[in-house]
């Protein structure tokens, strides 16, 4: 009986490295094959005006901030996920020197209350978020069809924003912008401009005896999710450094984020003035 138990125990311990290796392989596969984002399909009625736009919009791509070795160590020590680029930047700028005489030393430094991460639950487009232009022609006296195309009559600034007041709004907007861009595959910005005189060659035919209307809309995405806040502390214990997060709270939030350099068109022909 004793020999049987010993054989079982030895077999178990021999198999442990195999289980550990299998888990590491799974973790590596997750890292190398992250979940693909859901790319939004752009309808035919929506056109890219990047080349035609007379107002050059600045690129709003938010660069992914790389944490330093110390910052990565601190982030890994936190029980709450940290994605806030402003907090990561502050940690990158911090320097904590270890000393061989630090045995028994302990200190806790309060770094403030921060929005720690944002989790997206929905990214949905509204292709007619804001009306920005109307091209019109009266062809009621005409005997044949008349062609019109899009010409931006005046400069239009399209703004997005959060749907509710929230602490550290600018930091939250940065995290939401990153997630919305990943989920949609679109170029997004909380503010975009369409310049006067912007044109597209696409032709729309107004039949004889009709009024023709070509409406232009600025599209946007409606981003919804949850932001997590917490009080952040840095604990120094001997030569070890770690992050402790206390009083963690979560809050639902939404935002409208315009799509840069895109216009959605709607054409209609009618007998009467609209």
Task: Give the label of every model feature segment.
Residues 143-202, 240, 247-274:
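Membrane-insertion modules used to breach or fuse lipid bilayers
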Residues 1-25:
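Sec-dependent N-terminal signal peptides of Gram-positive bacterial secreted proteins and lipoproteins
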Residues 211, 216, 220-260:
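Domain-length functional cores that host ligand/cofactor binding and catalytic or interaction surfaces
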Residues 169, 208-211:
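Solvent-exposed, conformationally flexible loop/turn segments
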Residues 25-163, 187-203, 213, 219-221, ...:
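Deployable pore-forming modules of oligomeric membrane-permeabilizing proteins
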Residues 12-13, 19, 101, 136, ...:
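Phenylalanine-focused residue identity feature
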Residues 20, 29, 59, 245-251:
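Short, highly charge-biased, low-complexity peptide segments
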